[in-house]
Amino acid sequence: GRPNEGLRIDPVEQARRIREAEQNVKFLHDHGVKHVFANVGTIFGCPVQGEVLIERAYEFVDRTFSIGFDEIEHSDTEGTATPDRVYEYFSNVLEKYPDRNMHSFHVHDVYGMGMTAYYAAAQAGVSTFDCSMGGIGGQVANIVDGVPVKGAGAYYYDNCRTGLVETCDFVTM
């Protein structure tokens, strides 16, 4: 892996890595792997760049499927999505890629909006959701020299609010 490098690589290197991903996905399919899964993270917000334009997220979805992945886990890893943006995003994605088996949704419940984000995604047609027993989990790991370290900076929040959506809450909904 190349943690946190994506923001600093030039377009030539990006193109090389995309070709490499295409070759790897093809290799996996050719050797019996039936379902190759990718994650498109920071759809709605990025700890480094701030709010993400929805058009940019659509570009990543298109690119990921064009590489040959079978499913995307769409992720709000910053927990900043509002229900209206989630509904708009998934309505548009599912219009273009209507097979529900191609999509799942992962939310960090930083601001207590995870359940409303899941509800909005369900209303748009998403049927696979990533939940966590007891809300265990938190923010995306901060990596320094390949080692996870404690996060620092304005985008790290109160540890009491950084878990994932709890499975029992999701079932109750």
Functional labels for PLM-detected ranges:
Residues 1-173:
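Catalytic cores and adjacent flexible loops of soluble metabolic enzymes
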